[in-house]
Amino acid sequence: MSPLTAGQAGTSFTIDYEQPGSGQLRARVTGRRGGLETLLEYWYAIADEARRIGADMLLVVDELAGDPLPPEQLQGWVGAMAGQGFEKFRIAYVEADGSRIALLEMAEIHAREHGYNARVFGNESDAAMWLRHGER
């Protein structure tokens, strides 16, 4: 799969896709973190690719540089994801910067309240294990 490079003014990101197994999509996101619009842009791109290949499990590895969104924008992000089909995916999200895990766990709680089967992890091996074998 060829990578996607995109981003708005002042931000840029690249998504490298792999298919580690049947029904799975691994998306590694690198580059510069932007605002809510950038976050939505890369998540929509990942969902499009997952639908294109027929994946139902997403492993998203976030290696973006820059400051995370504030909590109120993370809540807005969860709401903006409605109607995009994310409810159909099992999503394991890996945050490379361990200091951000607590903030992202709040987003995980909001996502679960909105019907998403998603978890946040600090490392890829735990995320991959949950994706394949964790509680459904």
Describe each region flagged by the PLM.
Residues 2-136:
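Amphipathic, Lys/Arg-enriched alpha-helical "gate/interface" segment within cytosolic domains
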